[in-house]
Amino acid sequence: MDTIAIPALNRPVDATVEIPGSKSITNRALLVAALAQGDSTLENALFSEDSEYFAKCVEQLGIPITLNPHLAQIQVSGKGGDIPAKQADLFVGLAGTAARFITALVALGNGEYRLDGVPRMRERPMGDLVTVLQNSGIKINFEGNSGFMPYTIYGQQFAGGHFRLKANQTSQQLSALLMIAPYAQQDTTIEVEGTLVSQSYVKMTCRLMADFGVDVTQTDDNQFHIKAGQRYQARHYTIEPDASNASYFFAAAAVTGGRVRVNHLTKQSCQGDILWLNVLEQMGCQVLEGEDYTEVIGPEQLQGIDVDMNDMSDLVQTLGAIAPYANSPVIIRNVEHIRYKETERIRAVVTELRRLGVKVEEFADGMKIEPTPINPAAIETYHDHRMAMAFAVTGLKTPGIVIQDPGCTAKTFPDYFTRFFKMIGQ
């Protein structure tokens, strides 16, 4: 297995970094551009395993896409809600967003569409989304367990109507239904039962739909109404840098007492993970905001924090990786749903922190991390890109940290380690 040794620094980080476009925005923009009538250009798009699986699936459905990674540009020739392909065998890898968005998209088609992914993808929850589609009259044939990949969807134009949806494990299913709803045969109302996790991603979806010309009415926190007959407008759209991926570079400033500036990303971002800046401020960092950048300056000593991370749950690993360097405990709450991500993320973070000698208490929905001197260790990443990226930051302050399977970052940030080593001057 490949490994990367992280060099511990005896000085603060001092760098300005450029971060590729947001994965979440790239995938949403790609879907609505595919549904729009005409040509859209997506600038600063993310090119990674996840986004490329998604783009390939859309192209297999008969919607022309031109990828230009050198310009970070995607051109989409939308078909106005039509799915030209009448049959497709679609593979999504481990891309949960692609899996859910493509599942919803083919419901607008009139054909036979098989979806599958890697073994871990077959374990990730799809049940509530496919149940809604079945309740709308769409036939789905499951090859294994009901509600899980692989399955074949027999598309017939999504009927719309009133649906109830559980979104306590992922909000991606809700986002998927929202984005196809304008092309339903009748108005659509989606009522979320119970807790809606990762609400910030749903807000992102609604904002992007509005940017492409479609309105969503939200009557309360858990009910959404979309009028049928609305249509996305093809357009030129610039995608902002990925706030989740920026978190690792800001964290590097935090643990080394240094300075990191990220261009083209501000607190006005539509991404929920921009809340990471608030967490760092509470831990003692200084956050400076310019017209088109954000800069984090780390303190001499990080402070502990007790934080609900439900709306920025992709950053649990980032906080976990720097928590041992705080002067008091770090408590992470309300993220039980991350047990169903690329890996069982709560257990993975707890296991690797204990491997480093850190005292950690695991909860059903989070963990408590005590300030602890860190021992050298090789970090298991569980094929999870965020484990690799987060624990690389730990190694900036403790000698002897090695990241196993660093190539797993290709899922969302293929050149992460190139940019990471450039940041630290190596």
UniProtKB/Swiss-Prot annotation:
Keywords tagged on the record: Amino-acid biosynthesis, Aromatic amino acid biosynthesis, Cytoplasm, Transferase
Active site: 314 (proton acceptor)
First-tier enzyme category under EC: transferase
A GO cellular-component term linked to this record: cytoplasm
GO terms, biological process: amino acid biosynthetic process; aromatic amino acid family biosynthetic process; chorismate biosynthetic process
Disulfide topology: none
Pathway where it operates: Metabolic intermediate biosynthesis; chorismate biosynthesis; chorismate from D-erythrose 4-phosphate and phosphoenolpyruvate: step 6/7
Chief localization: cytoplasm
Residues the entry annotates as binding phosphoenolpyruvate: 23, 96, 124, 172, 345, 386, 411
Matching SUPFAM superfamilies: EPT/RTPC-like (SSF55205)
Reactions it catalyzes: 3-phosphoshikimate + phosphoenolpyruvate = 5-O-(1-carboxyvinyl)-3-phosphoshikimate + phosphate
EC number(s) per entry: 2.5.1.19
Single Gene Ontology MF annotation: 3-phosphoshikimate 1-carboxyvinyltransferase activity
PROSITE patterns: EPSP_SYNTHASE_1, EPSP_SYNTHASE_2
Cell location: Cytoplasm
Binding positions for 3-phosphoshikimate per the UniProt entry: 23-24, 28, 170-172, 198, 314, 341
Family annotation (InterPro entries): Enolpyruvate_Tfrase_dom, Enolpyruvate_Tfrase_sf, EPSP_synthase, EPSP_synthase_CS, RNA3'P_cycl/enolpyr_Trfase_a/b
CDD domains reported in the protein's UniProt record: EPSP_synthase
Family membership noted in the UniProt record: Belongs to the EPSP synthase family.
Function of the protein: Catalyzes the transfer of the enolpyruvyl moiety of phosphoenolpyruvate (PEP) to the 5-hydroxyl of shikimate-3-phosphate (S3P) to produce enolpyruvyl shikimate-3-phosphate and inorganic phosphate.
Subunit structure: Monomer.
UniProt name for this protein: 3-phosphoshikimate 1-carboxyvinyltransferase
Upper classification of the organism: Bacteria, Bacillati, Cyanobacteriota, Cyanophyceae, Nostocales
